[in-house]
Amino acid sequence: MDSPLSDGSRPPQQQNLHPLADYQFSAEEVKALRECNTESFLQRSLPFGTGLGLLAYFGVKNGYLQGNGKYGAVPKVVMGVILGYFVGKFSYQQKCAEKIMRLPNSRLGEVLRQRRQGGGVINTISPDESLTRAFTLAPFSPSSADVYTDEGLNPSRSTALNLDTESRPTLAGLDDIYRPSLDSSGQMMDTELPLEPAKPGQTYEDLRKKNREGYATHQQSPYSKPYEPQAPVRQRLVEPAPEAATGRPNKNKYGDSWQD
């Protein structure tokens, strides 16, 4: 509760800074809003609702949308009309705002003009952006004097991100990096292994000569001789035996002949 002042009066209440608080619309503004309502319905909501309703109807009829088992395409058509109504109202807001801004001596039009220009009390900054900007101001941003650090008191102390491993003292007897273990006692280090001599490279002439020698050896092999076709077999013609000179062959009544 507000405590009374020394003279018994109460402090004045803090006024709301919103420019449209307890705002009374003028007759011209009410007329403009009614015209906007009628025009948005006739010019936007009615065409959009009719179009979406027809699309829903033909979609159910042609099988693109699934209709209701009892009411058919009616639910889809109603949803299309309602969606078109709200889309039309929303799309006409900018044109309605321009009509109100053209009114003379209109406080609502002045507020809309300030909002479009980005000035005044009402601007286009969202609540999230306003909160972000408020926390980046000087009262919320830490200064160098407010941040506590002990680096100046003990600058020689090494941290987890600044380790001085090269200047630390090491003992020769404790350095077991290259000390042989039981598993590698009989093995030499990689640096002590003898390197194989480099093989001389082969030239094109050497490869050509080697290829010719391999081809000649392949030709001399008995299994690599070319296939020779066999000579065709000639058939001997059998000469018919001459008939006996003596006597004519005997024939029966069927025309068969034989010799005695």
Swiss-Prot record:
Positions with biased composition (Basic and acidic residues): 205-215
Name this protein carries in UniProt: OCIA domain-containing protein 1
Positions with biased composition (Polar residues): 155-164
Ranges where the record places region Disordered: 146-260
InterPro entries per UniProt: OCAD1/2, OCIA_dom
Protein family according to the UniProt entry: Belongs to the OCIAD1 family.
Annotated Gene Ontology cellular component terms: endosome
Boundaries of every OCIA domain copy: 1-110
A UniProt-annotated Pfam family: OCIA
Domain of life: Eukaryota
